[in-house]
Design a protein with these regions (language model features):
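Conserved beta strand-loop-helix elements of the APE1-like EEP
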Residues: 55-75, 202-224, 248-249
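Short proline/glycine-enriched turn/loop segments at secondary-structure junctions
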Residues: 51, 202-205, 233-237
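Metal-dependent phosphoesterases centered on the DNase I-like endonuclease/exonuclease/phosphatase
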Residues: 129-212, 217
Length: 257
């Protein structure tokens, strides 16, 4: 099976033909508009989709193709730092406070978490901090076989800060602890922060390139998985992000959680 994660940089309705050329089973798209508030043609393309967002123009969408079925997973919870009396956004939070996450199942078989981490104003837990907070609540749900976490994390270990427990490197280790590893880094042998292939080009400038989009797969899928990153010569015409194409050899899969 083939899965694509891509930050489309808005106006997905104008870019579906380019996506269709990748021939994926499911598309997980960041920064896309809500099909329910868009054109008839885009709604037809979207099919039985899932979507969450902060405005009708920018959200996180899941679009199944080829007869595949996705179902929203009801992941709700809260976390409070132990031993803390006063409660604020740094010491306690709920799933609804965090942006943007979309957990779902595919064909009652694979479990996915689509991610587009966001900046939350002056919150020190912006971007990768949002995912770190999410893990404190939902680590248990993610510790399953046939699990895939993927999306635009807006993060890399090159931006790790001192005295901060929610750095990119810390999150990578927390994911490793629950048997989720980056497919790209597994297949290339490269360390986080030393990537030779980039996924994001600031202002679509080839000289301002970063690796901030990821696919993490559970340990049982690692040997069956490979990831390809789109060519900027093609994809910079559509977005500042490159699509990541995840291919899973399902012939080795035993169905069901």
């Amino acid at each position: 099976m083939k899965f694509v994660t891509w930050n489309c940089n808005g106006a997905l309705r104008k870019k579906t033909e380019a996506l269709d050329a990748l021939d994926a089973d499911v598309y997980i798209i960041q920064e896309c508009e809500d099909p329910a508030q868009s054109t008839d043609a885009f709604r037809d393309w979207a099919g039985s989709y899932l979507w969450v967002g902060t405005s009708k123009h920018k959200g996180l969408g899941v679009f199944p193709k080829k007869g595949n079925t996705v179902k929203l997973a009801a992941w709700f919870g809260a976390f409070k730092q132990p031993g803390v009396i006063n409660s604020n956004s740094s010491t306690s939070w709920s799933t609804a406070d965090l942006k943007l996450f979309l957990p779902f199942t595919l064909n009652e078989d694979f479990q996915f978490l689509g991610v587009w981490t966001k900046a939350e104003g002056a919150d020190v837990f912006s971007y990768i901090g949002q995912l770190w907070k999410y893990l404190q609540i939902h680590r248990g749900q993610l510790r399953r076989e046939r699990t895939i976490l993927l999306g635009d994390l807006n993060s890399n270990s090159i931006w790790d800060g001192p005295d901060r427990r929610w750095n990119h490197s810390d999150v990578v280790e927390e994911l490793r602890d629950i048997e989720l590893q980056s497919t790209y880094h597994r297949q290339t042998g490269e360390a986080h922060g030393q990537e030779s292939t980039q996924t994001f080009f600031l202002h679509r400038n080839l000289e301002k390139a970063y690796h901030i989009d990821y696919v993490f797969t559970s340990g049982d899928l690692l040997d069956q998985a490979r990831v390809e990153i789109g060519d900027p010569k093609t994809w910079l015409n559509f977005s500042d992000h490159m699509p990541l194409l995840l291919v899973i050899d399902t012939s080795q899969r035993t169905k069901g959680f």
